[in-house]
Amino acid sequence: MGAQIRVYRQKIASTSSMKKIFKAMEMIATSRINKSRQALEGAYPYANALTRAASQIATQHNISHPLTTVPDQVRRSAVMVFTSDRGLAGSYSSNVLKRTEELLELLRSQGKEARVYLVGRKAKAYFDFRHREYDEFWTGNTDNASTERAEELTERLMHDISAPHEDGGVDEVLLVYTQFKSMVTQEPRVLRLLPLEIADANDLGDDVSERFEDLREHASHFEFEPNPEEVFNEILPRYVRARVYSALCHAASSELASRQRAMKAAGDNATELIKKYTRLMNNARQAEITTELTEIVSGAEAL
């Protein structure tokens, strides 16, 4: 009985230590997600303004550009996958990788070749374990979006979409990341980044035009200097970089939200285990006391 009580005490002590770790990680994720959400919300106006400007030029000046023209036949696609560097985030990375597998299967069924780029150690480990090929990977700070990382990813994507097909160029660029909707809802998403889909700027119901009525009412009166073509060529790389940065912000916020929920659930489970082991330890102690009393009474009666 004494040995059994010691076992339960050890389990209670180890579970209590793990509970402290879970609580600390939950608090860290909670504190960092506020900063990540602010970065995500701050990226919206800039990206939406660039979208409106690009649409304004393309629709009103009839500008044709290779990055806005869908080829007659898409033969090769670039797929960039955003996962996490670390675990302990629930099913965050596995959901993205599952969506990636579905996308790659769809591309194969359509006869398209896929060039895969991985962001996050989880994606790299997944492909390495299955001996799957990928073109390049980036790791580090997946839960902290940065403009430097967005610039690096954008340069690679712009290089591939602009390169000739015989040199490994691609016809379209697809992003697979987790869209942050709320603290409890995050959904894997596939976004076709390039070629751009240009819509009529006057029909765009984006956040910027909703906040600033003058932009919506007088959008058609904009003039672009020195000329619309040069402005359009300058806007496109900035637009792509803004969209990549937005995907990084969504992924970082989703990762932190998933980790916060996972650590809270782990802490709650640890609390239940501590209660269970405490109850079993008390039962074992009561059984030991009962046995000792029975032995004492039996010995007294024998005398």
Curated annotation (Swiss-Prot):
Superkingdom to which the source organism belongs: Bacteria
Signal peptide positions on this chain: none
One Pfam family cited in the UniProt record for this chain: ATP-synt
Gene3D superfamilies reported in the protein's UniProt record: 3.40.1380.10, ATP synthase, gamma subunit, helix hairpin domain
SUPFAM superfamilies to which the protein is assigned, alphabetical: ATP synthase (F1-ATPase), gamma subunit
An individual GO BP term: proton motive force-driven plasma membrane ATP synthesis
Molecular function via GO: ATP binding; proton-transporting ATP synthase activity, rotational mechanism
Single GO cellular component term: proton-transporting ATP synthase complex
Localization per Swiss-Prot or TrEMBL: Cell membrane
The keyword Ion transport belongs to this UniProt entry's keyword annotation: yes
Keywords recorded for this protein, A-Z: ATP synthesis, Cell membrane, CF(1), Hydrogen ion transport, Ion transport, Membrane, Transport
Membrane topology of this protein: Peripheral membrane protein
Assembly with partners or alone: F-type ATPases have 2 components, CF(1) - the catalytic core - and CF(0) - the membrane proton channel. CF(1) has five subunits: alpha(3), beta(3), gamma(1), delta(1), epsilon(1). CF(0) has three main subunits: a, b and c.
Described function: Produces ATP from ADP in the presence of a proton gradient across the membrane. The gamma chain is believed to be important in regulating ATPase activity and the flow of protons through the CF(0) complex.
HAMAP family named among the record's database cross-references: ATP_synth_gamma_bact
Family: Belongs to the ATPase gamma chain family.
This protein's name: ATP synthase gamma chain
Organism: Kocuria rhizophila (strain ATCC 9341 / DSM 348 / NBRC 103217 / DC2201)
Gene symbol of the encoding locus: atpG
